[in-house]
Regions:
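Charge-rich, low-complexity intrinsically disordered regions
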Residues: 1-60
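Active-site proximal beta-strand in glycosyltransferases
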Residues: 102-104, 118-136
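Donor nucleotide-sugar binding/catalytic pocket of nucleotide-sugar-dependent glycosyltransferases
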Residues: 154-165, 171-187
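Short alpha-helical segment that forms part of, or immediately flanks, the ligand-binding pocket
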Residues: 243, 265-270
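Acidic donor-binding loop of glycosyltransferase active sites
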Residues: 247-260, 273
Length: 301
């Protein structure tokens, strides 16, 4: 038996018996019998001998072009309309013209989004935006459940948060690298050239402040009245002028519980501006208001 394990060190006799019904029906139920069967028959038949793939918590990302580089058309949800032009230009997409050809669908927020997916018979690549995959939200939960009924769909997660949420809903996504930041526009700024403001990302438009930690950042503002603040949803600036806004600030707050791609975080990272944000590798992590205030104090020096 020792010679056998020298030749087949990974042989798992219990696994070997459990995965083959014919062995159990033949009364093979112990180590010696399993080894004998494998030696006489299983080896020649290339039968499996042990578990190869086990649970793996390490998630590797794929370049998004590797997944959708061959696709020419896209559909962008109205829920992500502020990104539409940049998204289409970045990937050189055309508006959707054929329901039979592969198509990228960016965001699933509205009835129109679902109707477009339903009538598309070709291969569908859904790039989830963030809040549309938040199953704690009743609307998103309904959307996720409906999406499961579609066929010929590849799901793309642009953040680990989205990846985990989709997995928890029984959807197996591809985790992709997604960064549309124009680094010729968003360039590093020396720390001593940054302004004295605190930039708070609380959405593109008023009405969704709760998603970005309204109660938390308002507490921060009350406890730190000596600072001036810029709120994103009160700032109407063309995208190519955003670097001028960012460099007025020495730190950004994006206090989400769940998040998508966090484009503002990527832009700040490109400019070397610190960001308090839990859902990105770059962000400074926080658990409570005191943590946030401590980060602000350290970065203001």
């Amino acid at each position: 038996m020792s010679n056998f394990y020298e030749q087949y060190p990974k042989f798992d006799w219990k696994f070997y018996i459990n995965v083959y019904d014919d062995l159990r029906k033949a009364g093979i139920n112990n180590e010696q019998a399993a080894i004998q069967h494998f030696t006489n028959y299983g080896c020649k038949e290339k039968r499996r001998t042990h578990q190869i793939i086990q649970s793996n918590t390490s998630i590797s990302t794929l370049p998004i072009q590797q997944v959708i580089g061959h696709v020419n058309q896209c559909y962008v949800s109205d829920g992500l309309s502020t990104f539409r032009t940049r998204f289409m230009d970045f990937f050189q997409f055309n508006d959707i013209t054929s329901t039979e050809e592969p198509c990228v669908f960016f965001g699933v927020y509205t009835d129109s989004d679902l109707q477009s997916l339903l009538k598309h018979t070709g291969l569908k690549y859904i790039i989830w935006g963030g809040e549309d995959a938040n199953y704690h939200n009743g609307q998103a939960r309904a959307t996720l459940n409906e999406i499961k009924h579609l066929h010929n769909v590849e799901h793309l997660a642009i953040s680990q948060c989205i990846y985990t949420r989709l997995l928890n809903q029984g959807i197996s996504p591809i985790f992709v690298e997604f960064n549309m930041v124009d680094k010729t526009l968003f360039q590093p700024i020396p720390r001593n050239e940054l302004g004295k403001y605190i930039y708070i990302f609380n959405g593109q438009i008023p009405g969704r402040e709760h998603v970005y930690g309204k109660s938390v950042y308002e507490t921060v503002m009350k406890r730190l009245p000596q600072y001036k603040y810029i709120l994103s949803n009160q700032t109407s600036v063309e995208h190519d002028l955003m670097p001028d806004v960012y460099k007025q600030c020495f730190i950004m707050l994006r206090l989400t519980t769940h998040d998508g791609n966090a484009n503002s975080v990527q832009e700040s990272e490109a400019m070397d501006i610190p960001v308090i944000h839990n859902q990105s590798d770059y962000g400074l992590k926080w658990k409570n208001v005191d943590d946030i205030i401590a980060h602000i104090s350290q970065c203001s020096v």
